[in-house]
């Protein structure tokens, strides 16, 4: 894993990509830091800088992660990785930690800005609140990196990987607004869960190469959903609402912006990161044996 990490991290700075991405995020934070915090004397860095520039991650993260696995598949070097002594988890984690380290560079500059505010007369409580906000911002970025790394492994085209990552993050960014549009009741919930059941059944059928198993899985899931819709429709609606809430990737960060250290937000981001790293490892494991 260490060799993969070093190789990936160095590759970002052999060309211009690492420098451009770091400069892009630092410039975004720097402009808001200057315009809001220094000129107006506002000490809430988490809100006036990080929260105001969080949409920049929609561009930064997909471009950062687009080449992680897609380039390997395009150049066919993924076959060398999959047949090397390094485990699948070593490959996935090595690439993930390399991208997280690149993302940590602009975050380190943000930390310097926070200490500048403190040196100019900020309180210790404001310093701790801003550092907590930066910590959650980093966890948010790591969760987005894990998601985009997974999407990068599904294609060998870097542009498609970047567009898919941007689309997924944009959907998560807009989900708090979109969630109110889907509160139409249990019928909508049934339709959405049926679609999810179909996708899960298709994945099960493809993974096992069994059409019969896929059909039986879909039939069983549909039967269960129909029974739940007829007998306990409120449960279906509540579950649907919980699913939509789980898709709001950027919402937990607001707890830190409001100067409240939220353990559930930390657990949420760590869980999202672990889930998508697991999906990536499973996809690579499948290709290794195929």
Per-segment meaning from a language model:
Residues 1-71, 96, 112, 203-213, ...:
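Hydrophobic alpha-helical transmembrane segments
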């Amino acid at each position: 894993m260490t060799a993969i990490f070093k190789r990936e991290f160095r590759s970002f700075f052999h060309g211009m990509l690492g420098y451009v991405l770091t400069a892009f995020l630092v410039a975004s934070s720097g402009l808001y830091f200057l315009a809001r915090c220094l000129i107006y004397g506002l000490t809430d860095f988490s809100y006036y800088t990080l929260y105001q520039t969080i949409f920049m991650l929609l561009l930064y993260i997909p471009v950062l992660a687009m080449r992680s696995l897609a380039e390997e598949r395009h150049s066919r070097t993924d076959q060398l990785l999959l047949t090397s002594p390094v485990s699948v988890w070593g490959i996935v984690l090595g690439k993930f930690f390399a991208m997280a380290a690149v993302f940590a560079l602009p975050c380190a500059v943000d930390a310097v800005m926070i200490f500048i505010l403190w040196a100019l007369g900020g309180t210790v409580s404001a310093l701790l609140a801003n550092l907590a906000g930066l910590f959650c911002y980093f966890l948010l970025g790591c969760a987005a990196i894990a998601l985009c790394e997974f999407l990068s492994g599904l294609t060998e085209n870097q542009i498609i990987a970047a567009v898919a990552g941007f689309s997924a993050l944009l959907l998560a960014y807009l989900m708090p607004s979109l969630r109110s549009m889907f509160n139409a009741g249990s019928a909508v919930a049934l339709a959405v869960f049926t679609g999810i059941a179909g996708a899960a059944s298709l994945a099960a059928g493809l993974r096992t190469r069994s059409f019969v198993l896929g059909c039986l899985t879909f039939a069983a899931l549909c039967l269960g959903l129909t029974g739940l819709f007829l007998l306990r429709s409120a449960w279906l609606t509540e579950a649907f609402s919980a699913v939509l809430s789980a898709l709001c990737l950027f919402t937990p960060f607001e707890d830190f912006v409001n100067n409240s250290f939220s353990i559930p937000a930390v657990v949420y981001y760590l869980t999202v990161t672990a889930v998508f790293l697991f999906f990536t490892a499973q996809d690579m494991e499948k290709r290794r044996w195929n």
